[in-house]
């Protein structure tokens, strides 16, 4: 005997994560990894390419406008790091080399 369905299961709205984490280092902790710090200071374009490659994307991706912001947001999403795209934009706008160093340290620590 079959019974009619009286209530449909409800979907979940949005993304909720109870296991969110923080960045392993702050934006201005550049001296934690001196090699990354020097690279970010003197050749940030090379560091951006390395971060993109370590993230799993093409190393030429940073040549596209806005792609470093997308990679930073992707790192946050992949590792469930708290924050927002607005926060990512502010960090990259006001101290891009330090932010690139933070991204490189995060990928190094997580991989």
UniProtKB/Swiss-Prot annotation:
Transmembrane segments: none annotated. It holds the Pfam family PLAC8. NCBIfam families: A_thal_Cys_rich (TIGR01571). Belongs to the cornifelin family. This is Cornifelin homolog B. It comes from Xenopus laevis (African clawed frog). The lineage of its organism: Eukaryota, Metazoa, Chordata, Craniata, Vertebrata.
């Amino acid at each position: 005997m079959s019974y009619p369905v009286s209530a449909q299961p409800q979907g979940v709205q949005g993304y909720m994560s109870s296991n969110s984490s923080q960045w392993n280092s702050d934006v201005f902790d550049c001296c934690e990894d001196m090699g990354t710090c020097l690279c970010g200071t003197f050749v940030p374009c090379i560091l951006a390419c390395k971060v993109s490659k370590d993230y799993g994307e093409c190393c030429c991706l940073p040549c596209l406008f806005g792609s470093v912001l997308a990679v930073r947001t992707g790192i946050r999403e992949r590792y469930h790091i708290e924050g927002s795209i607005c926060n990512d934009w502010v960090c990259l706008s006001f101290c891009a080399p330090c932010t690139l160093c933070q991204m490189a340290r995060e990928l190094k620590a997580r991989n």
